[in-house]
Regions:
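Ribonuclease/tRNase effector modules and their secretory precursors
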Residues: 1-205
Length: 205
């Protein structure tokens, strides 16, 4: 069954981070409330999500930084990570494939205790839109919160008129999900827009 995803996603505004290296980013995140448990309300219905010190280590590793467009963009997203998780939607759900020789594959088997949720969201940095992909490890035993595992942020190109204000009083800006996910493939290499169903709104659009 196809995942139903929203028609639009709210854009999270980013600012330049006051740090330029992973060590300082780690210290800032620990002292500014990034680490800790997000409630179901905090995540806008995605369940509890834990952002741990181990999560930070993974998110600020060299390999994680390399997946984002620039380190500056990666650090800017860290400062708003909780907001990004809240405003993002679940775009993929798949098994936790076992890693062998540095690669995860269905051929290697799966971890039966965990499934992977991939969240997609939108941010704006220096007036340029960005796609944010956040990976959660969701424990199938509901007694444990999901674990924020990694995130990556990349610049995207859009056409004029593809962002629009959300109805007041939110005063937020949104992006059409069909634009956000254009060219994005799931873990199996299939375009996400082919395997997800965009929800309809009241006017049927």
């Amino acid at each position: 069954m196809k995942l139903v995803i929203p028609k639009t996603v709210n854009i999270v505004e980013l600012e330049n981070a006051p740090f330029k290296c992973a060590k300082d980013a780690d210290a800032w995140a620990r002292s500014h409330g990034i680490v800790g448990l997000m409630s179901n309300v905090d995540t806008a219905g995605k369940g509890e999500v834990a952002i741990s010190v181990h999560s930070l280590n993974k998110m600020l590793s060299g390999s994680a930084l390399a997946k984002s467009s620039t380190p500056a963009l990666h650090f800017a997203a860290l400062m708003r990570l909780r907001d990004i998780i809240r405003e993002s939607f679940v775009g993929e759900v798949h098994p936790d494939y076992i890693k062998v020789d540095g690669k995860r594959s269905p051929d290697n088997g799966i971890n039966p205790l965990v499934e992977i949720w991939v969240l997609y969201g939108c941010a704006s940095f220096a007036d340029f839109p960005c796609r944010v992909k956040t990976t959660l490890k969701r424990f199938l035993d509901n007694n444990f919160p999901s674990k924020a595992y990694s995130y990556e942020i990349s610049n995207i190109e859009i056409l004029r008129g593809t962002v629009a204000p959300v109805a007041r009083p939110s005063n937020k800006i949104s992006m059409d999900v069909s634009i956000l996910l254009n060219g994005v493939c799931d873990v199996n290499g299939v375009p996400l827009l082919d395997v997800c169903e965009i929800e309809t709104v009241a006017d049927g659009s």
